[in-house]
Structures are given as structure tokens and as C-alpha cells.
Amino acid sequence: MIEIEQYFEDYEVGSERVTGGRTITETDIVMHAMHSGDFYPHHVDAEFAKTTPFGQRIAQFSCTFSIGIALTASIVNKRAFTYGFERL
């Protein structure tokens, strides 16, 4: 884990954060459906999904977004998540 201390003013428009990669699996899709209640057939029904333009099940947006956020967890900005914590 890398710790940084970066303030709002330090971020530049267009800056990027490079992370490692991760494959979204069938298990990810099914588990996310169970956690979120998103059981639409194009996510969980393999036979139905074959009839779609994708030809297979597709991950929920919220699943891909969650995984994307998790990939950034290797860089921790102490200012971003503990600001004001000392006053609690």
C-alpha cells in the first residue's frame, strides 16, 4: 500500500491513476447480483444472454464500478479519508 498526502489543489485535470488489472468473473457477476438485487436476465441468465448482442452475460455497472474503486485502494490518501477525523 502506498500512502500519499494530496490536497484538492494538487490534482490536475486529466491526471490518471494506473492500477493493476483484474478479470471480472462469472462468480463476481452472480455474487454482485445477490448483494445488489440486480437479477436482470442479461446479467444472470446465460441462455437469455446468448440472444443479446453481447452473446454472453454482462456485468452490472455497479459491479464494474465497485471493482474499479477497489483497484485504487492500493493508494491511500490520508487527507482524503481522514480529514476532520481528529474532531470526532
Where are these predicted regions, by residue range?
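Hot-dog-fold acyl-thioester-processing enzymes
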Residues: 1-85
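Hydrophobic/aromatic beta-strand elements that line small-molecule binding cavities or substrate pockets
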Residues: 88
